[in-house]
Amino acid sequence: MSITNEQILDAVAEMSVMQVVELIEAMEEKFGVTAAAAVVAGGASAEAAAEQTEFDVILTAAGANKVQVIKAVRGATGLGLKEAKGLVDSAPAALKEGVDKAEAEALKAQLEEAGASVEVK
């Protein structure tokens, strides 16, 4: 009688964290592998960076012309005056998340023109 993958997963789910760590160490020793090598191996990070299609626009500082920055934030986000002021006052803060590169760069240029410091991540 063989054990199914689901039975193995259920058994691991019932283990404590220390038991799982001991299991991993035993598997590393038995099979001659390390868990860290599997995480580090490959070009996954370079591949993920090349495929980035969504960007976050982060307001890092309002600068000297805070009123103009608040106006620019209102125009870009559609927020009310109070919400836009709160967002600018709480910098660094995310203005927009998950936007395409063109929109992120346009928003960055608009806010920098108003005097703000902006990052696109």
UniProtKB/Swiss-Prot annotation:
For this UniProt entry, what's an example GO CC term?
cytosolic large ribosomal subunit
Task: Give a single Pfam family match.
Answer: Ribosomal_L12
Q: Which InterPro entries match?
A: Ribosomal_bL12, Ribosomal_bL12_C, Ribosomal_bL12_C/ClpS-like, Ribosomal_bL12_oligo, Ribosomal_bL12_oligo_N_sf
Keywords of this entry: Ribonucleoprotein, Ribosomal protein
Q: Which GO terms describe its molecular function?
A: mRNA binding; structural constituent of ribosome
GO BP field: translation
Task of the protein: Forms part of the ribosomal stalk which helps the ribosome interact with GTP-bound translation factors. Is thus essential for accurate translation.
To which protein family does this belong?
Belongs to the bacterial ribosomal protein bL12 family.
Subunit comment? Homodimer. Part of the ribosomal stalk of the 50S ribosomal subunit. Forms a multimeric L10(L12)X complex, where L10 forms an elongated spine to which 2 to 4 L12 dimers bind in a sequential fashion. Binds GTP-bound translation factors.
Q: Which HAMAP family match?
A: Ribosomal_bL12
**What is the protein named?**
Large ribosomal subunit protein bL12
Q: Can you name the source organism?
A: Vibrio atlanticus (strain LGP32)
